[in-house]
Design a protein with these regions (language model features):
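Surface/interface-facing alpha-helical segments and adjacent flexible terminal/loop regions used
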Residues: 2-10, 15-36, 48-279
Length: 279
């Protein structure tokens, strides 16, 4: 277990409830899904599996459970990031964030910096915090101009289209991928399907399904889902999130959103390492 940066520790039951409330409150709907993993931020990091655990050969039950646990941890992290990007922080979510514990060392410098910024900010909240965060959310992600350079716009199309416009080719591509996996945005989601929150939520859903498949002994389905995740990481997330998170560092002012930028960038690096080991 990694060293923690806060003294607030949640029980296993509380952590599981936090995960359901945080990770499950996003814009995708996928029918019946496995429950979100009951883990906390101290457990999220590189999985450390070797090739024999992830290869085509049949795994032992212990290896399957270890890999399933890694997918559950990944799903938790994707869900947390997705919720932070989806909408402003509300009172309930702020309380959940305050109760969370964060690792002091993950082995990734960007993630470590992100956790330090988040923990520091959450440790000094007051009555003005929600307003401050709402203002910063607008500043960072919505902006005040009419061109494509007034904020870190949270849409893949803005970062991959020549004119930095929304609802371009990237949106059509991810929509097709969502539908291929039986996932669609929920009725109350009004933004484009290539919003960062939905792309992260999609990865959460796939990781949950991979964990479920492993728990059920379906290694072939787990391997297929892992390949879908690797392709989505390579073809979409890696194409724009590094630049997007750098832009967040320009526009965001609070340590919560600055920390979110670093945490996202670092987790993307960890995911690349994970996929190199297991996919």
């Amino acid at each position: 277990m990694a060293e923690e940066t806060t003294g607030t520790v949640c029980s296993a039951d509380d952590c599981a409830e936090q995960v359901e409330n945080i990770a499950g409150d996003c814009g995708c709907s996928a029918g019946t899904e496995s429950a979100a993993a009951g883990v906390d931020a101290t457990e999220v990091g590189a999985a450390g599996f070797d090739e024999t655990e992830a290869g085509a050969a049949s795994m032992s039950s212990e290896e399957r459970e270890d890999l399933a646990r890694a997918h559950e941890q990944r799903a938790w992290m994707y869900g947390l990031l997705s919720r932070l990007y989806r909408v402003e922080v509300d009172p309930v979510f702020l309380d959940q964030l305050r109760a969370m514990r964060f690792p002091a060392s993950t082995g990734n410098d960007a993630m470590d910096e992100g956790y330090r910024l988040l923990a520091g900010y959450l440790g000094r909240t007051d009555a003005s915090t929600l307003t401050e965060l709402a203002v910063d959310y607008v500043r960072a992600f919505i902006g005040h101009g009419i061109d494509g350079h007034a904020a870190a716009y949270p849409f893949e199309s803005v970062y991959t289209s020549a004119k930095r416009l929304m609802m371009q080719g990237a949106r059509d591509e991810v929509l097709a991928l969502y539908r291929a996996e039986g996932v669609d945005k929920s009725a109350d989601w009004k933004d484009g399907e290539d919003h960062v929150a939905l792309e992260l939520e999609f990865m959460k859903t796939l990781a949950e399904r991979a964990a479920k498949a492993l728990h059920e002994g379906d290694e072939a389905e787990a391997a297929r889902l892992l390949q879908v995740q690797r392709a989505f990481l390579d073809d979409h997330l890696r194409k724009w999130l590094p630049t997007f998170t750098r832009d967040m560092g320009i526009f965001a002012k609070t340590d919560l959103y600055l920390g979110l930028a670093r945490l996202t960038a670092g987790f993307l690096q960890v995911e690349e390492e994970f996929m190199a080991e297991v996919a």
